[in-house]
């Protein structure tokens, strides 16, 4: 059974409201879904006879500030039985919460915590949603495109006081404008 069969079969059997777009490539299949249907879609992919996705490779976050639903959450899956890779993608905004898939894939706990910590995308029913890579007192989410490069505070070791201190960063520049347009997508003069 190959990727083409899995793609065709999934397209025919899945409810159309679960998947609003699918793409097939030699490296695997891509399913685009709404956050409301993410959990049922992943249940189908894990338990159905012709998909049998048993491995959650990772969960990634991507920030597209120009989009209305600016965050894209990508689930990279592997079916060892059929030697097939499947990528499930969904989009969310700052307030949309995504269903946690820890009950399906226990390893998702770490990945969901990372996506929440770095991007601020929240997961419903996550057993332990707290920061994993940044400090507990950290403000903001550092992989968002609108997060300042310098951060908000400076953390350093103060030798005379013999302790770590946090101080607000003093910037002479009050406002910075970020141009999110890609230079490759602009019109050419030729």
Curated annotation (Swiss-Prot):
GO cellular component, one term: mitochondrial inner membrane
Keywords linked to the UniProt accession: Electron transport, Membrane, Mitochondrion, Mitochondrion inner membrane, NAD, Oxidoreductase, Respiratory chain, Translocase, Transport, Ubiquinone
Protein name: NADH dehydrogenase [ubiquinone] iron-sulfur protein 3
Its biological purpose: Core subunit of the mitochondrial membrane respiratory chain NADH dehydrogenase (Complex I) that is believed to belong to the minimal assembly required for catalysis. Complex I functions in the transfer of electrons from NADH to the respiratory chain. The immediate electron acceptor for the enzyme is believed to be ubiquinone.
Gene of this entry: NAD9
Oligomeric and partner information: Complex I is composed of about 45 different subunits. This is a component of the iron-sulfur (IP) fragment of the enzyme.
Organism taxonomic ancestry: Eukaryota, Viridiplantae, Streptophyta, Embryophyta, Tracheophyta
The enzyme's E.C. designation: 7.1.1.2
Catalytic activity line of the entry: a ubiquinone + NADH + 5 H(+)(in) = a ubiquinol + NAD(+) + 4 H(+)(out)
Species: Oryza sativa subsp. japonica
């Amino acid at each position: 059974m190959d990727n083409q069969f899995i793609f065709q079969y999934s397209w025919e059997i899945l409810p159309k409201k679960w998947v609003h777009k699918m793409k097939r490539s030699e490296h695997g299949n891509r399913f685009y879904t709404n956050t409301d249907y993410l959990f049922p879609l992943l249940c189908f992919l894990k338990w159905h006879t012709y998909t049998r996705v048993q491995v959650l490779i990772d969960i990634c976050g991507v920030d597209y500030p120009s989009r209305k639903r600016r965050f894209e959450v990508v689930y990279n899956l592997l079916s060892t039985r059929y030697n097939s890779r499947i990528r499930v993608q969904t989009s969310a905004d700052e307030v949309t919460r995504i269903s946690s898939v820890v009950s399906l894939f226990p390893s998702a706990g770490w990945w969901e915590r990372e996506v929440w910590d770095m991007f601020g995308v929240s997961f419903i029913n996550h057993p332990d949603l707290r920061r994993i890579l940044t400090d507990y007192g950290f403000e903001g989410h550092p992989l968002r495109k609108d997060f300042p490069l310098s951060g908000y505070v400076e953390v350093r070791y103060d030798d005379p006081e013999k302790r770590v201190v946090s101080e607000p960063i003093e910037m002479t520049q009050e406002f910075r404008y970020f141009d999110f347009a890609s230079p490759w997508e602009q019109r050419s003069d030729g």
